[in-house]
């Protein structure tokens, strides 16, 4: 018998499309967990941190920017994300040169923003103190901090879990923290504020 009157077979492609499998040539988007997909990228995205944002804004507007900040809170509240936003604000520049200094107002992606938020900017260096606790790790920072930033306004060091640094390591860090070069800023993150710094340095804490 002829198949001319039979309805077309929709099992190929259509069924797969309905299952969300897509066509073989269609590129699949990489999966990201919600915490990364909706990670804040500016101060406007931060919820419940008005006091901190106001303090940072006042520091920028008056030109009284401290050499270091320390962010504290339980795990998962966004300390490292906030540190990256702060690094972005310190180095926010537009291609036309209209932004002359640090600002909390970042409506568009600046020259350095994408690289900073993706942790791949050469002038924004991140170190996990939980796995880099020794004096040699701190000495690497002490040696590199003297060099000017390659392209950004400031060289920013983000040190996570700073309370995990050994006493000897923090003592080796002390001179650099007290008298850093003008082009260097430090942002520390910790879940244990009492153990951070071993009581040797006073830093603005949020």
Place the predicted regions along the sequence by residue:
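P-loop/Walker A NTP-binding region and its immediately flanking N-terminal helices
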Residues: 1-206
